[in-house]
A protein has these predicted regions:
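Aromatic- and acid-rich polysaccharide-binding/catalytic face
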Residues: 151-164, 197, 206-237
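Aromatic-lined substrate-binding rim segments of carbohydrate-active enzymes
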Residues: 51-120, 171-190, 236-239, 245
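Substrate-binding cleft of secreted/luminal carbohydrate-active enzymes
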Residues: 225-232, 256-341
Length: 486
């Protein structure tokens, strides 16, 4: 009997651990303004070489739970951000370098740093170019001498992105392995990290896909999820399936399986050098987080936490005004167990909230099926005219602590999350008493994204058999997939 009880407790512990959603524990760091994409990440009017600024921002990242820093590149267009012997410095002589400022702060806080050994020229570096490979090695030689004995030095990041369409080419694998071999010779036991893209168009079931992964001489692959890049109109469902498939391959590959989730969206058209990266809605980011965790990733890092999430009141503000602070606040609220974000996390995780009879409105609003980030998903119920009404029959009088409604937002097709919901309770289904009205502030960076969110009325302390929900929107169509009553 005791053995059976112990087994059940172990199983419960295992299931609980499996359900835990790992937060974002790492961020990429980019020093250089390269084009319009970097307008908020690497502002041209801000001194990106200021060591005090970097010490402050790294400390703020540590406060929010980031313990892994990935320096994308140490040089760009002939300017180096460390004391390089063969390239002009990108910071004033006599001042501590940005790389040293980051390493010093990371040392003091127990953080880990991966250093990128580029750019030989610029962001268009090509691993088939002998000059690029040789310059990367030269960077690596100096960086190893300067930083490899630091407590925070965790390894190398090879910044030239490989593409998985349809799988990594032989020359991409060979280029990575040449740099990796030099890294292992210089710093035995130190890890090598890459962050390739292209899963949306990968031929994952092709044996050559698995072979290209297994042929890589790296320790960590942090796959770009490409949700921010919007490689597909509605990328979330496919992204989660692709990560699941790749996770199965990594069980055999002996390489750490990381996710690099893109927490940005665009202020104009995607994937060009003339649009600016801006913070995405946290509802979208949370769906990405849950998805890659369900695939079994070892860690979650992001391009990019620095500047897309920014601590309110920082002496060195970064990112898009107001909304970088708002994304930071939403993320920290989720980390601290905010009920709204907890319910949305549970929805993404597939929790069974049960079903009830709907006496007014579509029965699909309480059938246990939640809509994907796609307005064409069959789970969505559409309401026009700016108003949604439904009545849920709980079957008998019950205590009611919270009511949540799951909505879709897709600006390009006129789908807008309502401005508020009103919750009313009744014992007979005819006479209702209003118990709470909750307003919703929509996210402004919505030019491209489709995402879902919950409007939650909690701490109701109500009792009744019937629950009436009314949602109001001043414009656009309302799409709701489910109403949850607890």
């Amino acid at each position: 009997m005791k053995r059976k009880l112990l087994f059940l407790l172990l199983m419960l512990s295992s299931l609980t651990a499996k359900a835990e959603v790992k937060p974002i524990s790492g961020t990429f760091i980019n020093f250089f303004w390269q084009d319009e994409r970097n307008n908020y990440m690497n502002q041209r009017n801000v001194d990106q070489s200021d060591p005090q600024r970097w010490a402050c921002k790294i400390g703020e990242l540590h406060e929010r739970g980031v313990d892994i820093l990935i320096i994308v590149t140490v040089a760009n267009e002939g300017r180096a951000m460390y004391p390089c012997s063969f390239m002009e410095h990108g910071y004033p002589e006599g001042r501590k370098s940005p790389v040293d400022a980051i390493m010093d702060t990371a040392d003091s806080l127990g953080m880990k740093v991966f250093i990128g050994c580029g750019w030989a020229r610029d962001q268009l570096d090509d691993l088939t170019d002998p000059y690029v490979i040789e310059t990367n090695r030269h960077f690596m030689d100096e960086l190893a001498e300067l930083y490899s004995r630091r407590p925070s030095f965790e390894g190398w990041y090879i910044p030239v992105e490989g593409c998985f369409i349809p799988y990594l080419s032989d020359y991409a694998v060979q280029g990575v392995n040449k740099i990796s071999a030099h890294a292992r010779e210089l710093t035995p036991g130190i890890k090598v990290l890459i962050s390739p893209y292209g899963l949306f168009g990968a031929d994952i079931e092709n044996p050559l896909f698995e072979k290209s992964i297994c042929d890589l001489d790296v320790d960590i692959i942090a796959y770009q999820d490409e949700v921010g890049c919007v490689r597909e109109q509605f990328p979330m469902k496919n992204m989660k399936e692709h990560f699941r498939q790749v996770g199965e391959i990594h069980k055999k590959a002996g390489i750490e399986f990381w996710a690099n989730i893109e927490t940005f969206t665009w202020d104009r058209e995607a994937n060009n050098w003339y649009s600016t990266l801006v913070p995405a809605a946290f509802g979208r980011v949370l769906s990405q987080l849950v998805g890659v965790n369900q695939a079994g990733v070892d860690k979650v890092v992001s391009f990019i936490v620095y500047s897309l999430f920014d601590k309110p009141g920082s002496p060195y503000p970064a990112g898009q005004r107001i909304y970088a602070n708002d994304l930071y606040n939403d993320y920290m609220a989720w980390m601290n167990g905010d009920p709204r974000w907890k319910m949305l996390e549970e929805i993404f995780s597939g929790k069974d909230f049960g079903t009830h009879k709907v006496t007014a409105g579509p029965q699909a609003l309480s059938d246990g099926k939640f809509g994907w980030e796609d307005p064409n998903d069959e789970a969505w119920c559409e309401f026009e005219g700016g108003k949604m009404e439904c009545v849920i029959d709980l079957g008998s009088k019950k205590d009611i602590s919270k009511v949540g409604a799951h909505f879709c937002d897709y600006y390009r097709e006129g789908v807008i999350i309502p401005q508020c919901i009103e919750v009313e309770v009744s014992n007979d289904g005819r006479h209702f008493t209003k118990v709470k009205t909750v307003t919703y502030e929509n996210w402004p960076n919505k030019y491209l994204d489709c995402w879902t969110d919950v409007i939650l009325a909690d701490e109701l302390n109500a009792r009744g058999r019937y629950v009436k929900i009314t949602a109001i929107s001043a414009r656009g169509r309302i799409l709701c997939s489910e109403v949850v009553v607890e």
